[in-house]
Amino acid sequence: IVDAGHELVYSLADNDIDLIFCFDPRPNNKGEWYQTMLNYKIHHGTPIIQRVGDCGTHGKPELTSLVKETVKHSNFIIFPSQWACEVIGYEGANYEVIPNAPLPIFHDFKRAESTNKKVKVVTHHWSPNPKKGYALYEQLDKYIANNDWLSFTYIGQWPIAYLPKNSEYYKPTGDNTFISEKISECDIYLTASEEEAGANHVLEGMACGLPVVYHNNGGSIPEYCGKYGVGFDSFEQMIDGIKEVNANYSKYKESVLGYEDQVPKAVSRYMEIINELSS
């Protein structure tokens, strides 16, 4: 925004704001929330662009209700997936789906080689929310103890109730170079996460050149990954999905190596919308 010659402020205290960008309708650390934005819009005629990044589907029904109400009053809405739009039940025409995208660093270490001798599966999550799929990851950690054809690498938060015993585990880190290198060393990206409005982790896995085995109830995830892997509905199907991708690895690998989306492309479309509404 600044590079495009615009001024950016983080409060509604000014009286000359040309456009409001709402990325969360809940109160911020200044106590400003969507109602504050709407009051400003009514008083000054300032349009609101609202990005719906969280639909509240991970145990926040009050957020779901709030988003459903606030999108009625925004001038333009950006959803990270068609699934998110449908969950909110939005039927207006003033919206666009702009999928999330990975940082360029996640493309830097991808390998074109076939699988390792032992199939290396990886995932990464920063939230301990149960809907990230920890019950299935726990099952997988126990499964690999007696199935040496497969290994599992986990990066990020893991609920303290069960820590992995047979997997390679790395605690959360903000080092994207480390994360992208570790993911790229593996063969298949796994996600058991459900009802994700805009799942970044799978996009990072795809950018690293890994086919994806994903939960069919993943929300945006089948939308993002459908061309690059296999879906599942149970632990048994998850294992079968890993075997399917491994057995036909060249096909899935060739497909995912064609995934080239990056953050700058998404940002460019955001800027076009901002310029259109602020002109």
Question: Which ranges hold each PLM region?
Answer:
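Donor nucleotide-sugar binding/catalytic pocket of nucleotide-sugar-dependent glycosyltransferases
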Residues: 75-109
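Aromatic "clamp/platform" in nucleotide-sugar-dependent glycosyltransferases that forms part
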Residues: 194-195
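A charged, aromatic-enriched C-terminal amphipathic alpha-helix characteristic of glycosyltransferases
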Residues: 247-279
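Acidic anion/phosphate-binding donor-loop and adjacent secondary structure
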Residues: 60-61, 101-118, 132
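Extended catalytic core of nucleotide-activated donor transferases of GT-like folds
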Residues: 3-73, 82-83
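Conserved donor-binding/catalytic core segment of Leloir-type glycosyltransferases
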Residues: 112-132, 138-142
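Conserved acidic donor-binding segment of nucleotide-sugar-dependent glycosyltransferases
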Residues: 226-236, 243-246
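Short hydrophobic beta-strand element within catalytic cores of glycosyltransferases
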Residues: 211-215
